[in-house]
Amino acid sequence: AVAVNSPFFPPDLYDADPETVLSDCWMENRVPVFESVLNPDGDPKVTFPEDIDSIDEALQRIADDETVVPTLLERGDRFDDRFEHFRHKHGSFWRWVRPVFDGPTRESANARIEFRPLPCQPTVRDTIALQAVFAGLLESLPRREHPIYNQPWADARENFYAAVRDGLDAELRWITADGTETTDTEELYAELFELARDGLELRGLDAEEANRYIQPLRERVDRRVTPASWKHERVAEAVGRGEPFAQAVWGMQAEYIDKQTETLIEGTFVDWL
């Protein structure tokens, strides 16, 4: 929700009037576009994944997934070439969160989880902030045995699509550390950032370092603004002044690039505000 960054397509792709586009657009269009283009009839391949309870189940999910590009592969010299056809299927196992098993040598063989919906960010520091928050959460949540692990799958799925659709305006369901269910976004984000800070400290950062990494995203929440909402507001204001929709979108994009150029390395997105 704090990272959304793609509310518009190129303006010549729209048939609807500007008011409809502005009211109906998703804040992160990459997710619905990928799903609509690549999902075949029947079981979807690009989707929020079902729960997985074991490594065996994760392996079986990939093995059972519909094959899109059948290929005969020659075995190479890598360790994971022993299961080259299974590894090849990773390339079309399109879940927004997915397991990956590989490794060029036995010593480097690994199982990892890819969290794939994170969009690109306007600056380097914003990108690092997003990675830091996720790294901190992945460290803190299991160590603290946080009750969000008990959230029903249906709620997690709805949270995902609500965040993609509405950004910071999404109504999200959260379970606090004391087990209380809430939709209070102020409480949700406050606890989320504290858990991220805790996780970074558990990995060896001091409190000042951890807070510095997290701060760009914390400020977005405090100011109720994301890159997507910034883009949406710019286009809406231009259309409100009477500009043609296409001119409004291209003008917004030009301003985005100018500000990104000014802040790419040393600044953050909130410096634009």
Give the location of each predicted region.
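Loop-rich catalytic cores of soluble enzymes, especially ATP-dependent carboxylate-amine ligases
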Residues: 1-111
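Acidic, glycine-enriched catalytic cores built around paired aspartates
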Residues: 9, 89-95, 99-111, 118-273
